[in-house]
């Protein structure tokens, strides 16, 4: 049993110190943070001055250094998601960012503005839905990983034993990590999605749980973070685990998703779908092998399902992926290319059964994890499906939900919940819960990476494609276009700051936030708007002859259209690009 983190906390604030008091039964510990020296020590309750301003909090997210100095981030609101084998799982819904400094008089005007921007970035990440924690259970590991642990591992604190891929506040907790005596105040927080449901089929009650864990390695937003880095970390990597708990028995099925693991980029440039660029100089095999070496160590066999188009701009990526798998020649990897859009065109989504039939035997070989009510491991999952499309969102989620349902069917039959011959699809009440949960999972993952809800969720929710769903997809696509081009630079900077990819240095001579804009940034849009306005005016206020009117309209019309295409040609100068972490042209 892991050493639990403190659940009941009070924050006492004085001009000199922050005191975080543990209020659990029998606890006397008080975490003390000196607001001047930033020193972290352990005290007892009698050391808290009675003059301190006191408030309840629900956890320490960590500390961060900005231009004005250090800040303490605490969880101020939480909601209960559910209970997980008698462990309560919480969702953090509100936070406070508290400055160590009592005044900002030591800052220049530029520093004040930069500090304000950095705080806005921090709050932007904190306002993204999907931060989860438990004070008694390790959410970062799958059931199977937790079953293969040593007694020493079991005695570690939650922070020490957590899978660092999924601890989103790992950078913020670095000061507390260095001092084992304060680890019970350090709360590892997961980012992703968790839902829990008590369900009934044939009068038999069971708990059904869905957990998606987003990796904090190579984290970022849709168009600015693609492919892999030099260490083999894939963009938008998410581990999704589906769990069943029935009569003391526990079963789980794990899948992963992640960007195509070669060096490629797709930077926004005002076009609806920027052209993907595959690096011509990077050592693709080195990064590719690093990625799959780690995946095989963690998960076992890899069945890769590549859902991207096999023609057009996506074709070179599909060919590169297939070539890499073939060149590596690993017996632990199987590669399946399934052109989702081609196979399911004209709303023929029933054709997804072709893919399910193709991988059915492989899925049976991979199996799932199962522990009986006596705690004995009955079955191990021997590998995972690693699915991807371009974003690893919409198409990927549809396929993952279908694979998970097939595994769940087998698990519930083995546990005796489903009778022989019964189909999960026929259990209307459970099907509604199942489909909505997977659609909610899709939306959460999409909002965290692309900035909007997922596309194609009408199929996930209802089992069929609808015209209303197509309209909603169009609306979400428009919002994605705007965000990807005009706000994602700020979003990427926010994530880099939060995760520690960028460290603030108040002594920096030049502010990284101050990036001068080229003359084109203001001049060309103004020229286009003026030209378009003049074109409309000439149409409304006709000249003496129609030929004169036509000449004016053509002149201003050509000027506005010409300027529009010049802006499009120079698209990268007009998008909101990241400013904090200098990224290579092709990552």
Curated annotation (Swiss-Prot):
InterPro entries: SAC_dom. PANTHER family: PHOSPHATIDYLINOSITIDE PHOSPHATASE SAC1, PHOSPHATIDYLINOSITOL-3-PHOSPHATASE SAC1. Coiled coil: none annotated. It catalyses: a 1,2-diacyl-sn-glycero-3-phospho-(1D-myo-inositol-3-phosphate) + H2O = a 1,2-diacyl-sn-glycero-3-phospho-(1D-myo-inositol) + phosphate; a 1,2-diacyl-sn-glycero-3-phospho-(1D-myo-inositol 4-phosphate) + H2O = a 1,2-diacyl-sn-glycero-3-phospho-(1D-myo-inositol) + phosphate. Phosphoinositide phosphatase which catalyzes the hydrolysis of phosphatidylinositol 4-phosphate (PtdIns(4)P), phosphatidylinositol 3-phosphate (PtdIns(3)P) and has low activity towards phosphatidylinositol-3,5-bisphosphate (PtdIns(3,5)P2). Shows a very robust PtdIns(4)P phosphatase activity when it binds PtdIns(4)P in a 'cis' configuration in the cellular environment, with much less activity seen when it binds PtdIns(4)P in 'trans' configuration. PtdIns(4)P phosphatase activity (when it binds PtdIns(4)P in 'trans' configuration) is enhanced in the presence of PLEKHA3. Its EC number is 3.1.3.64. The gene is SACM1L. It comes from the Eukaryota. The keyword Protease does not apply. The chain crosses the membrane at residues 521-541, 549-569. Residues 1-520, 570-587 are cytoplasmic. GO terms for molecular function: phosphatase activity; phosphatidylinositol-3-phosphate phosphatase activity; phosphatidylinositol-4-phosphate phosphatase activity. It holds the Pfam family Syja_N. Residues 122-451 form the SAC domain. GO terms for biological process: exocytic insertion of neurotransmitter receptor to postsynaptic membrane; phosphatidylinositol biosynthetic process; phosphatidylinositol dephosphorylation; vesicle-mediated transport in synapse. The modification N6-acetyllysine is found at residue 456. Interacts with TMEM39A. Interacts with SEC23A and SEC24A; this interaction is reduced in the absence of TMEM39A. Interacts with PLEKHA3 and VAPA and/or VAPB to form a ternary complex. Residues 542-548 are lumenal. Residues 452-587 are annotated as: Essential for phosphatidylinositol-4-phosphate phosphatase activity. It comes from Pongo abelii. It is found in: Endoplasmic reticulum membrane; Golgi apparatus membrane. It is a multi-pass membrane protein. This is Phosphatidylinositol-3-phosphatase SAC1.
């Amino acid at each position: 049993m892991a050493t639990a983190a403190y659940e009941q906390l009070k924050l006492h604030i004085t001009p000199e110190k922050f005191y975080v008091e543990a209020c659990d039964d029998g606890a006397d510990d008080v975490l003390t943070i000196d607001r001047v020296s930033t020193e972290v020590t352990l005290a007892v309750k009698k050391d808290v001055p009675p003059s301190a301003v006191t408030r309840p909090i629900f956890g320490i997210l960590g500390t961060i250094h900005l231009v004005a100095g250090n800040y303490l981030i605490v969880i101020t609101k939480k909601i209960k998601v559910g209970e997980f084998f008698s462990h309560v799982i919480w969702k953090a819904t509100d936070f406070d960012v508290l400055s160590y400094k009592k005044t900002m008089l030591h800052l220049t005007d530029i520093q004040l503005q930069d500090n304000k921007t950095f705080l806005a970035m921090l709050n932007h990440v904190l306002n993204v839905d999907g931060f989860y924690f438990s004070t008694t259970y390790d959410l970062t590991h799958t059931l199977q990983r937790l079953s293969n642990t040593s007694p020493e591992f079991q005695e570690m604190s939650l922070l020490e034993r957590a899978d660092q891929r999924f601890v989103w506040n790992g950078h913020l907790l670095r000061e507390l990590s260095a001092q084992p005596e304060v680890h019970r105040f350090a709360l590892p927080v997961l980012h992703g999605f968790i839902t829990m449901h008590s369900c009934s089929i044939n009068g038999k009650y069971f708990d059904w749980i869905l957990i998606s864990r987003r990796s904090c390695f190579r984290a970022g937003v849709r168009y600015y973070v693609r492919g892999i880095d030099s260490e083999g970390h894939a963009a938008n990597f998410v581990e999704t685990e589906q769990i069943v708990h029935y009569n003391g028995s526990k079963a789980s099925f794990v899948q992963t998703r992640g960007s195509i693991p070669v060096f490629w980029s797709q930077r926004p440039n005002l076009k609806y779908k920027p052209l993907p660029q595959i690096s011509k100089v990077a050592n693709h095999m080195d990064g590719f092998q690093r990625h799959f070496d780690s995946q095989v160590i963690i998960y076992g066999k890899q069945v890769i399902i590549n859902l991207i188009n096999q023609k057009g701009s996506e074709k070179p990526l599909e060919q590169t992926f297939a070539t890499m798998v073939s060149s590596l020649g690993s017996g632990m990897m199987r590669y399946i290319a399934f052109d989702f859009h081609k196979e399911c065109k004209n709303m023929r989504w029933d054709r997804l059964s072709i893919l399910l039939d193709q991988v059915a035997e492989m899925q049976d070989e991979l199996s799932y994890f199962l522990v009986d009510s006596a705690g004995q491991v009955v079955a191990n999952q021997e590998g995972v499906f690693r699915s991807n499309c371009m974003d690893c969102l919409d198409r990927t989620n549809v396929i993952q939900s279908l694979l998970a349902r097939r595994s769940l069917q087998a698990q519930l039959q083995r546990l005796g919940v489903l009778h022989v011959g019964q189909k999960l699809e026929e259990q209307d009440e459970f099907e509604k819960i199942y489909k909505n949960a997977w659609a909610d999972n899709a939306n959460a993952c999409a909002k965290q990476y692309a900035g909007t809800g997922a596309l194609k969720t009408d199929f996930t929710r209802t089992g069929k494609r609808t015209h209303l769903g197509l309209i909603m997809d169009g609306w979400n696509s428009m919002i994605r276009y705007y965000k990807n081009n005009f706000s994602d630079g700020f979003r990427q900077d926010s994530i880099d700051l939060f995760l520690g990819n960028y460290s603030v240095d108040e002594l920096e001579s030049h502010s990284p936030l101050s990036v001068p804009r080229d003359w084109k940034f203001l001049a060309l849009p103004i020229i286009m708007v003026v030209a378009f306005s003049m074109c409309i005016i000439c149409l409304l206020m006709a000249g003496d002859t129609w030929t004169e009117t036509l000449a004016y309209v053509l002149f201003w019309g050509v000027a506005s259209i010409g300027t529009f295409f010049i802006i499009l040609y120079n698209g990268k100068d007009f998008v909101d690009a990241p400013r904090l972490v200098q990224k290579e042209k092709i990552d």
